[in-house]
Protein backbone atom coordinates (compact mmCIF):
# COMPACT_ATOMS: atom_id res chain seq x y z
CA UNK A 1 0.00 0.00 0.00
CA UNK A 2 1.14 3.46 0.94
CA UNK A 3 4.26 2.35 2.83
CA UNK A 4 6.40 1.09 -0.05
CA UNK A 5 5.48 4.02 -2.31
CA UNK A 6 6.34 6.62 0.34
CA UNK A 7 10.09 6.03 0.03
CA UNK A 8 10.39 6.73 -3.70
CA UNK A 9 8.06 9.73 -3.42
CA UNK A 10 10.21 11.26 -0.69
CA UNK A 11 13.38 10.63 -2.69
CA UNK A 12 11.68 12.04 -5.74
CA UNK A 13 10.73 15.22 -3.90
CA UNK A 14 14.25 15.61 -2.53
CA UNK A 15 15.72 15.10 -5.99
CA UNK A 16 13.32 17.64 -7.47
CA UNK A 17 14.21 20.18 -4.77
CA UNK A 18 17.90 19.66 -5.50
CA UNK A 19 17.24 20.02 -9.22
CA UNK A 20 15.43 23.34 -8.65
CA UNK A 21 18.12 24.74 -6.30
CA UNK A 22 21.38 23.12 -7.47
CA UNK A 23 23.70 25.91 -6.27
CA UNK A 24 22.18 26.12 -2.79
CA UNK A 25 22.28 22.32 -2.56
CA UNK A 26 25.93 22.37 -3.59
CA UNK A 27 26.91 24.96 -0.96
CA UNK A 28 25.06 23.29 1.91
CA UNK A 29 26.09 19.72 1.13
CA UNK A 30 29.76 20.43 0.42
CA UNK A 31 30.22 22.69 3.45
CA UNK A 32 28.60 20.20 5.80
CA UNK A 33 30.53 17.26 4.38
CA UNK A 34 33.90 19.01 4.63
CA UNK A 35 33.35 20.05 8.24
CA UNK A 36 32.08 16.59 9.18
CA UNK A 37 35.13 14.95 7.61
CA UNK A 38 37.49 16.98 9.78
CA UNK A 39 35.44 16.31 12.90
CA UNK A 40 35.69 12.60 12.12
CA UNK A 41 39.45 12.77 11.68
CA UNK A 42 39.97 14.73 14.90
CA UNK A 43 37.77 12.40 16.95
CA UNK A 44 38.54 9.01 15.41
CA UNK A 45 42.01 9.20 13.88
CA UNK A 46 43.79 11.80 15.98
CA UNK A 47 41.76 11.07 19.14
CA UNK A 48 41.91 14.68 20.28
CA UNK A 49 40.42 15.47 23.68
CA UNK A 50 39.37 18.91 22.43
CA UNK A 51 37.96 19.72 19.00
CA UNK A 52 40.03 22.25 17.06
CA UNK A 53 37.27 24.57 15.92
CA UNK A 54 39.58 26.53 13.63
CA UNK A 55 40.27 23.41 11.61
CA UNK A 56 36.57 22.56 11.39
CA UNK A 57 35.89 26.12 10.25
CA UNK A 58 38.64 25.86 7.65
CA UNK A 59 37.27 22.76 6.03
CA UNK A 60 33.65 23.87 6.30
CA UNK A 61 34.42 27.23 4.69
CA UNK A 62 36.66 25.59 2.11
CA UNK A 63 33.97 23.10 1.15
CA UNK A 64 31.18 25.69 0.90
CA UNK A 65 33.15 28.31 -1.01
CA UNK A 66 35.56 26.48 -3.29
CA UNK A 67 33.73 23.22 -3.85
CA UNK A 68 30.19 24.47 -3.35
CA UNK A 69 30.50 27.61 -5.49
CA UNK A 70 33.68 27.62 -7.60
CA UNK A 71 33.72 23.95 -8.56
CA UNK A 72 29.97 24.05 -9.18
CA UNK A 73 30.50 26.81 -11.74
CA UNK A 74 33.53 25.12 -13.31
CA UNK A 75 32.08 21.61 -13.49
CA UNK A 76 28.52 22.45 -14.50
CA UNK A 77 29.08 25.48 -16.71
CA UNK A 78 32.66 26.06 -17.90
CA UNK A 79 33.61 22.46 -18.64
CA UNK A 80 30.20 21.69 -20.11
CA UNK A 81 30.53 24.71 -22.40
CA UNK A 82 34.04 23.58 -23.38
CA UNK A 83 33.26 19.89 -23.93
CA UNK A 84 29.51 19.24 -23.70
CA UNK A 85 27.99 15.79 -23.42
CA UNK A 86 29.02 12.37 -22.16
CA UNK A 87 30.99 10.92 -25.05
CA UNK A 88 34.16 9.05 -24.10
CA UNK A 89 36.28 11.85 -25.55
CA UNK A 90 34.36 14.62 -23.75
CA UNK A 91 34.47 12.80 -20.40
CA UNK A 92 38.19 12.00 -20.75
CA UNK A 93 39.04 15.62 -21.57
CA UNK A 94 37.03 16.93 -18.61
CA UNK A 95 38.73 14.45 -16.27
CA UNK A 96 42.15 15.52 -17.58
CA UNK A 97 41.34 19.23 -17.30
CA UNK A 98 40.15 18.83 -13.72
CA UNK A 99 43.12 16.78 -12.53
CA UNK A 100 45.93 18.44 -14.48
CA UNK A 101 44.72 22.07 -14.55
CA UNK A 102 41.94 22.99 -12.13
CA UNK A 103 43.14 21.12 -9.06
CA UNK A 104 46.88 21.97 -9.20
CA UNK A 105 46.30 25.61 -10.23
CA UNK A 106 43.18 26.46 -8.19
CA UNK A 107 42.21 23.81 -5.64
CA UNK A 108 45.48 23.38 -3.77
CA UNK A 109 46.60 27.05 -3.73
CA UNK A 110 43.17 28.07 -2.38
CA UNK A 111 43.21 25.22 0.16
CA UNK A 112 46.67 26.09 1.47
CA UNK A 113 45.96 29.84 1.55
CA UNK A 114 42.72 29.42 3.48
CA UNK A 115 44.37 27.03 5.92
CA UNK A 116 47.26 29.44 6.49
CA UNK A 117 44.91 32.39 6.98
CA UNK A 118 42.79 30.65 9.62
CA UNK A 119 45.84 29.13 11.30
CA UNK A 120 47.70 32.43 11.73
CA UNK A 121 44.78 34.86 11.90
CA UNK A 122 46.43 37.01 9.23
CA UNK A 123 45.49 37.88 5.65
CA UNK A 124 47.96 39.37 3.20
CA UNK A 125 50.48 38.71 0.48
CA UNK A 126 52.86 37.16 3.00
CA UNK A 127 50.14 34.67 4.00
CA UNK A 128 49.72 33.55 0.40
CA UNK A 129 53.49 33.31 -0.09
CA UNK A 130 53.85 31.13 3.00
CA UNK A 131 50.95 28.96 1.86
CA UNK A 132 52.39 28.48 -1.62
CA UNK A 133 55.79 27.61 -0.15
CA UNK A 134 54.16 24.80 1.85
CA UNK A 135 52.26 23.69 -1.26
CA UNK A 136 55.52 23.42 -3.21
CA UNK A 137 56.97 21.22 -0.48
CA UNK A 138 54.00 18.85 -0.60
CA UNK A 139 52.93 19.10 -4.24
CA UNK A 140 53.94 15.61 -5.37
CA UNK A 141 52.35 13.84 -2.42
CA UNK A 142 49.21 15.96 -2.68
CA UNK A 143 48.77 15.36 -6.40
CA UNK A 144 49.43 11.64 -6.03
CA UNK A 145 46.73 11.39 -3.37
CA UNK A 146 44.37 13.56 -5.40
CA UNK A 147 44.78 11.68 -8.67
CA UNK A 148 44.32 8.34 -6.96
CA UNK A 149 40.87 9.48 -5.86
CA UNK A 150 39.63 11.81 -8.57
CA UNK A 151 40.69 10.17 -11.83
CA UNK A 152 38.29 7.25 -11.32
CA UNK A 153 35.66 9.22 -9.41
CA UNK A 154 35.39 11.98 -11.99
CA UNK A 155 34.57 9.34 -14.57
CA UNK A 156 31.33 9.04 -12.60
CA UNK A 157 31.05 12.83 -12.17
CA UNK A 158 31.19 13.57 -15.88
CA UNK A 159 30.02 10.29 -17.33
CA UNK A 160 27.00 9.37 -15.21
CA UNK A 161 25.80 12.13 -12.89
CA UNK A 162 23.15 14.65 -13.96
CA UNK A 163 24.27 18.24 -13.46
CA UNK A 164 22.33 18.85 -10.24
CA UNK A 165 23.80 15.73 -8.60
CA UNK A 166 27.41 16.30 -9.57
CA UNK A 167 28.38 18.32 -6.51
CA UNK A 168 26.54 16.07 -4.01
CA UNK A 169 28.42 13.14 -5.59
CA UNK A 170 31.72 15.01 -5.36
CA UNK A 171 30.91 15.89 -1.74
CA UNK A 172 30.26 12.24 -0.93
CA UNK A 173 33.63 11.21 -2.34
CA UNK A 174 35.43 14.14 -0.77
CA UNK A 175 34.14 13.19 2.68
CA UNK A 176 36.98 10.67 2.62
CA UNK A 177 39.38 12.83 0.64
CA UNK A 178 39.03 15.96 2.79
CA UNK A 179 39.60 13.72 5.79
CA UNK A 180 42.89 12.66 4.22
CA UNK A 181 43.85 16.31 3.68
CA UNK A 182 42.87 17.11 7.25
CA UNK A 183 45.00 14.30 8.62
CA UNK A 184 48.08 15.08 6.49
CA UNK A 185 47.86 18.89 6.32
CA UNK A 186 45.82 20.01 9.33
CA UNK A 187 48.18 20.48 12.26
CA UNK A 188 47.21 24.07 13.02
CA UNK A 189 48.68 24.00 16.52
CA UNK A 190 52.12 23.23 15.10
CA UNK A 191 51.88 26.21 12.73
CA UNK A 192 50.84 28.60 15.49
CA UNK A 193 53.47 27.36 17.93
CA UNK A 194 56.20 27.56 15.30
CA UNK A 195 55.43 31.24 14.75
CA UNK A 196 55.34 32.21 18.43
CA UNK A 197 58.60 33.29 20.00
CA UNK A 198 58.59 30.95 22.96
CA UNK A 199 61.48 29.41 24.86
CA UNK A 200 62.56 26.21 23.17
CA UNK A 201 61.77 24.01 26.17
CA UNK A 202 58.23 25.36 26.45
CA UNK A 203 57.60 24.98 22.74
CA UNK A 204 58.95 21.43 22.73
CA UNK A 205 56.71 20.50 25.65
CA UNK A 206 53.63 21.81 23.88
CA UNK A 207 54.63 20.13 20.63
CA UNK A 208 55.00 16.82 22.44
CA UNK A 209 51.59 17.23 24.05
CA UNK A 210 49.89 18.07 20.76
CA UNK A 211 51.74 15.62 18.52
CA UNK A 212 50.49 12.25 17.41
CA UNK A 213 52.06 9.35 19.38
CA UNK A 214 53.79 8.02 16.27
CA UNK A 215 54.61 11.36 14.64
CA UNK A 216 58.14 12.76 14.22
CA UNK A 217 57.28 15.62 16.60
CA UNK A 218 56.35 13.25 19.37
CA UNK A 219 59.63 11.40 19.14
CA UNK A 220 61.83 14.47 18.74
CA UNK A 221 63.90 15.39 21.75
Which sequence ranges carry the predicted segments?
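Short, motif-level signal for alpha-helix interfacial/capping segments enriched in acidic residues
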Residues: 80-82, 125-129
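Short juxtamembrane and helix-loop transition motifs at transmembrane-helix boundaries
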Residues: 128-136
Amino acid sequence: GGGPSAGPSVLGRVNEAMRRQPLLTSIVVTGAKAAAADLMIQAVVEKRARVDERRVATFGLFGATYQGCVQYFLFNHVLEWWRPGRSVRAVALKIAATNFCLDPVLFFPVFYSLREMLATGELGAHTVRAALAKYRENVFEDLRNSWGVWFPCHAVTYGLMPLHLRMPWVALVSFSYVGLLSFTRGDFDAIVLAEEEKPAASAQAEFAELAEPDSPMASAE
